[in-house]
Curated annotation (Swiss-Prot):
Coiled coil: none annotated. PANTHER family: NICOTINATE-NUCLEOTIDE ADENYLYLTRANSFERASE-RELATED, PHOSPHOPANTETHEINE ADENYLYLTRANSFERASE. The keyword Lyase does not apply. The gene is nadD. It comes from Listeria welshimeri serovar 6b (strain ATCC 35897 / DSM 20650 / CCUG 15529 / CIP 8149 / NCTC 11857 / SLCC 5334 / V8). It holds the Pfam family CTP_transf_like. This is Probable nicotinate-nucleotide adenylyltransferase. InterPro entries: Cyt_trans-like, NadD/NMNAT, Rossmann-like_a/b/a_fold.
Length: 188
């Protein structure tokens, strides 16, 4: 029997409660054994200023999932030299774990960008894409995407960074304390 592993990639700058909720909902609805949080370098489609360091983002992710044994952090994209594409990551993971079905979890707002992903025609044969519905985003693409529903949330890392003084309710406590202690995003 094949293993079922979810992958939630992102900049996680910072990781927040909606990230946890997406991973939990996908794990439950798809009966996944575990979910890997895959922090990435700034992806080709994003340009973020004021970004936390890789080390800070990784530490916040580890704090967020601490004590949840079916969540793990995978650092391969941060360690890869040069550009890091999902295609390369999945090719490596499948080679390392051939007896595993991978479910790549993306926010509903990212589904419409799938046609622009590097080697998407090959990638859709390698993984099952899972679109987590968020408010006001519905996209149709010519690829099979498993859609799962998540309770409505409007949390985004961008909004948290831009309004850090009022963001405590959207962050796991340990992440909030880390942000305060390290004065990230202007938090003194």
């Amino acid at each position: 029997m094949k293993h079922k592993v979810g992958i939630l990639g992102g900049t996680f700058d910072p990781p927040h409660l909606a990230h946890l909720q997406m991973a939990e909902v996908a794990k439950q609805q798809l009966n996944l054994e575990k979910v890997l949080f895959l922090p990435n370098k700034i992806p080709p489609h994003k340009h973020i200023s004021g970004m936390a360091s890789n080390d800070a983002r990784v530490e916040m992710l580890r704090l967020m999932i601490e004590g949840i044994d079916y969540f793990e952090v995978d650092l391969r994209e941060l360690k890869r030299a040069g550009k890091s594409y999902t295609y390369d990551t999945m090719r490596d993971m499948i080679s390392e774990q051939p007896n595993t079905d991978f479910y790549f979890i993306i926010g509903g707002d990212m589904v419409e960008y799938l046609p622009k992903w590097y080697h998407i025609e090959d990638l859709v044969k390698m993984v099952t894409f899972v679109g987590v519905h968020r408010p006001h985003y519905q996209a149709e693409v010519p690829y099979d995407v498993v859609n799962i529903d998540m309770p409505e949330t409007t949390i985004s890392s961008t909004e948290i960074r831009n309004n850090i003084e009022h963001a405590e309710a959207f962050l796991p406590e340990k992440v909030w304390l880390y942000i305060k202690e390290h004065q990230l995003y202007g938090k003194k």
